[in-house]
UniProtKB/Swiss-Prot annotation:
PANTHER family reported in the protein's UniProt record: DNA ANNEALING HELICASE AND ENDONUCLEASE ZRANB3 FAMILY MEMBER, SWI_SNF-RELATED MATRIX-ASSOCIATED ACTIN-DEPENDENT REGULATOR OF CHROMATIN SUBFAMILY A-LIKE PROTEIN 1
HAMAP family: Helicase_RapA (MF_01821)
EC number of this enzyme: 3.6.4.-
Keyword field contains Transcription regulation: yes
Species name: Pseudomonas fluorescens (strain ATCC BAA-477 / NRRL B-23932 / Pf-5)
Name of the protein: RNA polymerase-associated protein RapA
A single GO molecular function term of this UniProt record: helicase activity
GO terms of biological process kind: regulation of DNA-templated transcription
Superkingdom: Bacteria
Assembly: Interacts with the RNAP. Has a higher affinity for the core RNAP than for the holoenzyme. Its ATPase activity is stimulated by binding to RNAP.
């Protein structure tokens, strides 16, 4: 039955104790609304099972008024459901304090209440609570928090960008890495770190419709982010007054949003902290006219504090289009296209001078003059040191120039040339005779490029008797190729789902080669199973056959043989296909196998990609521009042209490609590349993450957590476990992920090849959710144990108290970094002396044995009068350490923010991309954080009573 709630009553959240005291605002039907004034948060709960505990103090308790004065309770009245406390204040005067006027920061002394009420927990739970506090503290202070838990190999430039961007207040940046460098992972890392730190709590992701599924898979698989995909159907069917308010992370197709004004209104009303826009280069802007998509994103960017734009490289975009993206981020700074062009031209010689310094290690007189003109007299000493061969001075000079870079803080652009670490590509072409059955096919959209689809679609063709794969020579070739490669993993990609499914049938019927298929008609779970079957080295499929759309968002870097069963109609799609294997971190040469039908449009398309665009052996940053320029001539010539016409087109396109590539190379901005790559900072993060991966602390901790909650674990295979709820499962809300069970691994490499396994890190929802269940409830906050130590007289009682320094503040202030909930131990002997400095927790723990609950309860009741004053005395013992900890937290917070303010203020003087709002927000955060830390209080977290035996 639902509890009786009255407006004004004070309750505390069982799952979010850090919110402070809550005040009931309203009870409406089946919903209860509670305000938490300390943080400004409001929560709605289902009335039947609200995770709340009534705050009710007893005579003898000390309580605090919201104005700060204290009183000792003598009597409690219940007036129409509201509690009224009567007692004495500090001046020994009689006072009355209604619960509505209680301080929002009051702690709830739950541990002592439970101990004396006979609610004594198993001994192992007390240790679990202590270790949970320690691990939580360590993670909150870690520089890797939000960076190490992604299901991906740690890569330096991605980690550098993620930390640099995510640690800003309301970041507004352009991510413009070249293809294959992982812009989506960078954006996901920024989102993940901002969510974990509390800098953002509501995120909007706008993408082209065809990329929605890819983003959904990436966010869920790599980051464990439960993104809600919104389309017209979901929006219309929702019962909520504003469907967007029901989710923290919304994934929305821009095409639908532009056409639906009602959805736009709801989106604006929902309020967001961070907006991510993929494929932002497709937003069309001209000085005199903008597209509806650009106008909508511009309006959103005016109201949403943080904006991430993912786009093609500036060189691919052209200067005008590049300016249009920057204008979305900071319209005050980038308001005049002509001024932007002039500024870019003025900066080019400086970038060229830096290129010279990087390549030759010294500056020519002309380069020296250029940099001196840019830095002014303040750069003279630095330039002199550079000329003397001082390498440290060279690094400082580059940093000075970086700080002054016109777009260095808002634009991140890494290139393959700068990053390195990509595999070589090898092309194997297989011309095959075109079968007669394809020669008489009716013409259609790209019918000659995908003849099997057109053939099978003919009304007079029987699916069972006349299958295209019985005569198409590419199928026989594929079977022979797979047999030659034996058990080597091979990825096959084709344009259509029908072709993929037919190929699987063909391999099963004609060869018995183990194969699996991957297409857009399958749900995520089915695709996971197919990917896992392909990844399994021992019993898995040799070949995975993917359709174009079905393979989006999936990378199979453990394979290095790629069969392009047909060719796509656009070079970007070709690059996407090759990119399934050709990613940074791939350890093998990419073997590209391309069968095509001779004297058909397939042969000509192969020649176009290979001879004109060079798109097989290298990435093709100019492909989109060349397709746009030559596309109208290309399509007719694919089907019908003499050799002379065709060769002329190939030659013209090749010449234009070489010209554009030369332009791109000379336009390379080495300063920007240095800034985007992190100049070595990312490498340190990679090393730290790999070191953390090798530690055993997490598996050891999780084993104790699983034991406590009744989760059974058994070996699945090497580096993998199967988790299942046991009959004794303690809490059905434990975030196992699946009621039937789940397979997990702590091994990053295993997780990368087996997407059906959960990759367990400190950031995983199972770990975080389990830790929250321990700390937000009362689990393990009382225990009684027998201590076996010959130095102690039998019957001696020791009292171990765990306190935490608690600060109630909005998560966005990130005060947990400075004042984490590490346990402050106090171990009191019979004389009230604190022995904690001499007896470590683990040393003590090893000497303890459990006591039957009934015996423990009997002992506590007998010792209540002796224990209660000792518990009250414990706080005074740890108060000096608490005060030191708070002072140190304030010092570190002030030092960090002062340093960042000084850096940004100096930077603003030479680089206008530092926004005033950023400095104002940082100052406010400093003052607010220091004030909140001043109010930090000690909270009794757990009590363990030890009896010598």
């Amino acid at each position: 039955m639902a509890q009786q709630y009255q407006p004004g009553q004070r309750w505390i959240s069982d799952s979010e104790a850090e919110l402070g005291l809550g005040t009931v605002l309203a009870q409406d039907g089946r919903l209860l609304t509670v305000l938490y004034p300390a943080t400004g948060d409001t929560r709605q709960y289902a009335l039947r099972n609200a995770p709340l505990t009534r705050v009710r103090f007893s005579p003898g308790d000390s309580i605090t008024h919201f104005e700060g004065w204290k009183m000792t309770v003598q009597e409690v009245d219940d007036v129409d459901g509201l509690l009224v406390y009567h007692g004495l204040n500090g001046q020994n005067e009689a006072v009355t304090l209604p619960e509505t006027q209680l301080s929002n920061f009051i702690q709830f002394r739950l541990a002592s209440d439970r101990l004396f009420a006979g609610q004594i927990d198993p001994l192992a739970w007390f240790s679990l609570r202590y270790h949970t506090l320690e691990h939580t503290s360590r993670q909150l202070q870690s520089s890797l928090w939000g960076l190490g838990g992604v299901r991906a190999q740690p890569i330096a430039h991605q980690l550098h960008i993620a930390r640099e961007v995510a640690d800003r207040i309301a970041p507004r940046v352009l991510l413009a890495d070249e293809v294959g460098l992982g812009k989506t992972i960078e954006a996901g890392l920024v989102i993940h770190r901002q969510l974990l730190s509390g800098r953002a709590s509501r995120v909007l992701i706008l993408v082209p419709e065809n990329l929605q599924h890819q983003w959904l898979v990436e966010m869920r698989r790599r980051f464990n982010l439960q993104v809600a995909l919104f389309d017209e159907e979901r929006f219309i069917e929702s019962d909520a007054s504003n469907p967007f308010e029901d989710t923290q992370l919304a994934l929305v197709a821009l095409e639908w949003l532009v056409d639906d004004e009602k959805a736009q209104d709801a989106l604006f009303a929902a309020g967001w902290d961070l907006m991510v826009v993929d494929e932002a280069h497709h937003l069309v802007w001209h000085e005199d006219q903008v597209s509806p998509e650009y106008a909508l994103v511009e309006q959103l960017a005016e109201t949403i504090p943080g904006v991430l734009l993912l786009t093609a490289t500036p060189e691919q975009l052209g200067q005008d289009s590049h300016f249009a993206r920057l204008r979305l981020l900071d319209p005050n700074r980038f308001h005049d296209l002509a001024a932007f062009r002039a500024e870019s031209e003025n900066y080019r010689p400086v970038a060229e001078a830096v290129q010279e310094l990087m390549d030759k290690g010294r500056l020519s007189p002309e380069a020296h003059k250029t940099i001196h003109g840019f830095l002014g007299n303040e750069g003279e000493a630095l330039l002199a040191a550079v000329n003397d061969g001082d390498s440290e001075a060279s690094a400082r000079l580059v940093r000075e120039l970086l700080d002054r870079h016109g777009t260095g803080r808002v634009l991140f652009r890494n290139t393959r040339a700068a990053v390195q670490g990509f595999p070589e590509r090898k092309l194997h072409a297989y011309p095959l005779p075109c079968p007669d059955e394809y020669l008489e096919l009716p013409l259609g959209e790209h019918a000659e490029l995908y003849p099997e689809v057109s053939f099978q679609a003919q009304p007079d063709v029987s699916d069972d008797e006349q299958r295209w794969w019985k005569f198409d020579p590419r199928v026989e070739w594929l079977i022979d190729q797979l047999k030659m490669l034996k058990r080597t993993k091979v990825l096959v990609i084709c344009a259509h789902a029908e072709t993929a499914m037919d190929l699987e049938d063909a391999l099963r019927v004609r060869s018995g080669i183990p194969a699996t298929v991957f297409h857009e008609g399958m749900n995520i779970l089915e695709r996971d199973r197919a990917a896992a079957y392909f990844a399994d080295e021992e019993f898995g499929a040799q070949v995975l056959i993917c359709s174009e759309i079905g393979s989006e968002g999936r990378n199979f870097q453990f394979a290095h043989h790629l069969v392009l069963f047909d060719l796509p109609s656009h070079p970007d799609l070709l690059e996407q296909r090759i990119g399934r294997l050709d990613r940074i971190g791939q350890k093998h040469v990419i073997e590209l196998h391309v069968p095509y039908l001779e004297t058909s449009p397939q042969e000509r398309l192969f020649q176009w990609y290979h001879e004109a665009l060079n798109a097989f052996l290298n990435t093709c940053p100019t492909g989109n521009a060349l397709q746009h320029q030559f596309g109208p001539r290309l399509l007719p010539l694919l089907e019908n042209a003499d050799d002379g016409e065709w060769q002329a087109l190939i030659d013209a396109a090749r010449g234009e490609r070489e010209r554009l590539e030369a332009e791109l190379h000379t336009g390379r901005d080495r300063l920007l590349e240095l800034n985007s790559g992190g100049a070595g900072e990312g490498d340190a993060l990679v090393e730290a993450i790999l070191e953390q991966d090798d530690q055993f602390a997490l598996p050891i901790y999780m084993e104790t957590l699983f034991d406590a909650f009744g989760i059974d674990s058994e070996d699945h295979s090497e580096n993998a476990l199967i988790l299942k709820p046991s009959e004794k499962m303690l809490d059905a809300s434990f975030p196992l992920g699946d009621d039937e069970g789940v397979t997990i691994t702590y091994d990053r490499n295993q997780a990368l090849s087996r997407e059906d396994m959960q990759f367990i890190t400190w950031e995983h929802p199972m770990v975080q959710g389990g830790m929250d269940l321990v700390l937000s409830g009362s689990m393990g906050n009382t225990a009684v144990a027998l201590i076996k130590n010959k130095a102690l007289k039998p019957g001696t009682v020791l009292l171990e108290l765990l306190y935490v320094s608690e600060v109630v503040a909005p998560r966005s202030l990130q005060l947990g970094r400075y004042l984490p909930p590490a346990a402050l131990r106090c171990l009191l002997d019979a004389n009230g002396n604190d022995l904690s400095a001499r007896v470590a927790f683990e040393t003590l723990n090893d000497q303890l044995e459990s006591v039957p609950k009934a015996s423990a309860n009997k002992f506590i009741q007998a010792q209540r009068d002796q224990l209660a004053p000792k518990i009250n005395a414990g706080e005074a013992k740890v108060a000096p350490r608490h005060a030191e900890r708070v002072a140190e937290a304030q010092r570190r917070l002030a030092a960090d923010t002062d340093e960042e303010l000084a850096r940004l203020t100096a930077l603003q003087a030479v680089n206008p991309t530092v926004r005033d709002s950023e400095l104002v927000a940082l100052r406010q955060q400093r003052e607010q954080g220091l004030a909140m830390l001043e109010k930090a209080a000690l909270r009794l977290e757990a009590i363990r009573v030890l009896v010598a035996g």
